[in-house]
Amino acid sequence: MSGPYDEASEEITDSFWEVGNYKRTVKRIDDGHRLCNDLMSCVQERAKIEKAYAQQLTDWAKRWRQLIEKGPQYGSLERAWGAMMTEADKVSELHQEVKNSLLNEDLEKVKNWQKDAYHKQIMGGFKETKEAEDGFRKAQKPWAKKMKELEAAKKAYHLACKEEKLAMTREMNSKTEQSVTPEQQKKLVDKVDKCRQDVQKTQEKYEKVLEDVGKTTPQYMEGMEQVFEQCQQFEEKRLVFLKEVLLDIKRHLNLAENSSYIHVYRELEQAIRGADAQEDLRWFRSTSGPGMPMNWPQFEEWNPDLPHTAAKKEKQPKKAEGAALSNATGAVESTSQAGDRGSVSSYDRGQAYATEWSDDESGNPFGGNEANGGANPFEDDAKGVRVRALYDYDGQEQDELSFKAGDELTKLGEEDEQGWCRGRLDSGQLGLYPANYVEAI
């Protein structure tokens, strides 16, 4: 008698050689196309990040360059600080180049390769996927047919074994039962014999089909291997290509290996190391400290042709280039190293006027003693000029006027070298305002 039939013995494996399990290899072709799309999306997102970072650097550099130029920092340290803004602009350009390389080179390279490697069909899907599917199906078809016969033969054999075991159990139990007649006993014995014959027949058929499957297996394996290797070659091209693309992306992203990037920071370091504290201190001493020239008081003859000899001359701007001060015995020229700021902050302008308007009535333009060279111009409307505001202006300091576009006020003096004028609002408030914010009426 054969061994007992056990349905659990029918194990389903996940092997490539099982019928239909080649579909994972076929699916890999479709996955390859999708992965190309994923890589392009990945590159696009990184390019957006590079673009945004480059713009942020540019905006940061512009804002802080203006703040530094208008601020109180001076000399070589100012130039060193400003070099950071130059670094930001140059690095911004490099990140723009990274963005352009990612989009114009790397992404386009993947897109073109994908287009050449995968060919869409009118009915959907890719030509390469269909060729692989057809190749595997053709190689597996004869073997799959044999496997179907084998499964049927095995099932018949196992069923016959099950019937044989059941018949033998009944026949053995009947021997102990008094109610079973000899005729019934004989039928049970015949049933056992018949089941044994069925087991033998199904076993022979099962073994024969199994032998046939064994004979076709080598040919089946050869055909499947051939199609699989074709898929492997296609996948190898994709893997090698994407590796090359990733290396290109790395090369574009790695600014540390970019000679221009290295040069930017070499220049920045040189600019910072060029800052000289002693030089800056000497400059400040000569332009804003004890080293400045001075018109020391001395006896002056009265000259009827010069009615305002007692009035002090206006000081030059703090950082104006080529500022010259002269005295009675000679002229001494002091040149600023900071350069023309273009737009002077209220800090600088306030410093200049704080020294101009002293409490000495002989030099105070607000003084009321006419013997000192003239009357206070703020007290005489006839000496003022009516002007109209072109733009809104909000005073940033206590000595500045505030007005709206269209407001009228009185101009009480000429524009100074820093672009400010003295004026009076109709409310009587006196102060300073930007000269180019108004027009004569």
Curated annotation (Swiss-Prot):
GO molecular function, one term: cytoskeletal protein binding
Sequence segments annotated as region (Disordered): 310-380
Basic and acidic residues biased stretches: 311-321
Ranges of biased composition (kind: Polar residues): 326-348
Family: Belongs to the PACSIN family.
Name assigned to this protein: Protein kinase C and casein kinase substrate in neurons protein 1
Membrane listed as a keyword: yes
SMART domains: FCH (SM00055), SH3 (SM00326)
Lineage top rank: taxon: Eukaryota
Compartments in which it is found: Cytoplasm; Cell projection; Synapse, Synaptosome; Cell projection, Ruffle membrane
Phosphothreonine PTM sites in chain numbering: T181
Domain F-BAR: 10-280
Encoding gene (name): Pacsin1
Matches recorded under Gene3D superfamilies: Arfaptin homology (AH) domain/BAR domain, SH3 Domains
SS bond partners: none
Tissue specificity as recorded in UniProt: Highly expressed in brain (at protein level).
InterPro entries, per the entry: AH/BAR_dom_sf, F_BAR, FCH_dom, PACSIN1/PACSIN2_SH3, PACSIN1_F-BAR, SH3-like_dom_sf, SH3_domain
Positions of modified residues (Phosphoserine): S2, S76, S343, S345, S346, S358, S362, S402, S427
Record's subunit section: Homodimer. May form heterooligomers with other PACSINs. Interacts with MAPT. Interacts with TRPV4. Interacts (via SH3 domain) with SYNJ1 and WASL. Interacts (via SH3 domain) with DNM1; the interaction is reduced by DNM1 phosphorylation. Interacts with DNM2 and DNM3. Interacts with both COBL and DBNL. Identified in a complex composed of COBL, PACSIN1 and WASL. Interacts with EHD1 and EHD3.
Residues annotated with Phosphotyrosine modification: Y391
Organism, scientific name: Rattus norvegicus (Rat)
Post-translational modification: Phosphorylated by casein kinase 2 (CK2) and protein kinase C (PKC).
Task performed by this protein: Binds to membranes via its F-BAR domain and mediates membrane tubulation. Plays a role in the reorganization of the microtubule cytoskeleton via its interaction with MAPT; this decreases microtubule stability and inhibits MAPT-induced microtubule polymerization. Plays a role in cellular transport processes by recruiting DNM1, DNM2 and DNM3 to membranes. Plays a role in the reorganization of the actin cytoskeleton and in neuron morphogenesis via its interaction with COBL and WASL, and by recruiting COBL to the cell cortex.
Positions of the SH3 domain: 382-441
BP terms from Gene Ontology: actin filament organization; cytoskeleton organization; negative regulation of endocytosis; neuron projection morphogenesis; plasma membrane tubulation; positive regulation of dendrite development; protein localization to membrane; protein localization to plasma membrane
UniProt keyword list: Cell membrane, Cell projection, Coiled coil, Cytoplasm, Cytoplasmic vesicle, Endocytosis, Lipid-binding, Membrane, Phosphoprotein, SH3 domain, Synapse, Synaptosome
Sections of the chain in a coiled coil: 23-272
Entry GO CC: axon terminus; COPI-coated vesicle; cytoplasm; cytoplasmic vesicle membrane; cytosol; endosome; glutamatergic synapse; perinuclear region of cytoplasm
